[in-house]
Amino acid sequence: MNRLKEKYLKEVVPALMSKFNYKSVMQVPKIEKIVINMGVGDAVQNAKALDNAVEELALISGQKPVVTRAKKSIAGFRLREGMPIGAKVTLRGERMYEFFDKLVSVSLPRVRDFRGVSKKSFDGRGNYTLGVKEQLIFPEIDYDKVNKVRGMDIVIVTTAKTDEEARELLTLLGMPFQK
């Protein structure tokens, strides 16, 4: 079993139970899924850019991403409905815990001038969103093979009802929030 999941079951659950006075273990918030989305705007002119993004996302997440397509046509961006413009991955279960562990312990500390992630990025329903400016912070990405620096959005979906509960859950799991 993953070390982060073990930590969740042995330390985080009892801590949250006592802090929020839950009656049942099933009320304790947990991470449901992590969605990683990479928008590739230049895929409109350059089809190879999307292939590279898909490949990098597969390396980072450990599973094959799904290609996202444009919902609407936008003439200003020379975009037609149905054109591929990005890639996303939804992680659950073991892979999700592995990715979160890697993100918190390896990748985020590698960000330049890192002072912690924003406390304001909760959506009011207990989910947390985080933007990463470059894919190079992940250890799987080989610096020499990168042809373009791409960012991504990482959404951590929890079963928490409020932002306060979600913040406490993520803090106990090791998320480095700003002081």
UniProtKB/Swiss-Prot annotation:
Superkingdom in the source lineage:
Bacteria
Q: Which InterPro entries match?
A: Ribosomal_uL5 (IPR002132), Ribosomal_uL5_bac-type (IPR020930), Ribosomal_uL5_C (IPR031309), Ribosomal_uL5_CS (IPR020929), Ribosomal_uL5_dom_sf (IPR022803), Ribosomal_uL5_N (IPR031310)
Keywords, alphabetical: Ribonucleoprotein, Ribosomal protein, RNA-binding, rRNA-binding, tRNA-binding
Name the job this protein performs: This is one of the proteins that bind and probably mediate the attachment of the 5S RNA into the large ribosomal subunit, where it forms part of the central protuberance. In the 70S ribosome it contacts protein S13 of the 30S subunit (bridge B1b), connecting the 2 subunits; this bridge is implicated in subunit movement. Contacts the P site tRNA; the 5S rRNA and some of its associated proteins might help stabilize positioning of ribosome-bound tRNAs.
Instruction: Give the UniProt family note.
Output: Belongs to the universal ribosomal protein uL5 family.
- Would the keyword Ribonucleoprotein turn up in this protein's UniProt record? yes
Which PANTHER family does this chain map to?
A: 60S RIBOSOMAL PROTEIN L11-RELATED
The name of this protein is Large ribosomal subunit protein uL5
GO terms under biological process: translation
Q: Does the keyword RNA-binding apply?
A: yes
Note the subunit structure: Part of the 50S ribosomal subunit; part of the 5S rRNA/L5/L18/L25 subcomplex. Contacts the 5S rRNA and the P site tRNA. Forms a bridge to the 30S subunit in the 70S ribosome.
This protein's species is: Anoxybacillus flavithermus (strain DSM 21510 / WK1)
* Gene Ontology MF term list: rRNA binding; structural constituent of ribosome; tRNA binding
Gene that encodes the chain: rplE
Species classification: Bacteria, Bacillati, Bacillota, Bacilli, Bacillales
**Gene Ontology cellular component?**
ribonucleoprotein complex; ribosome
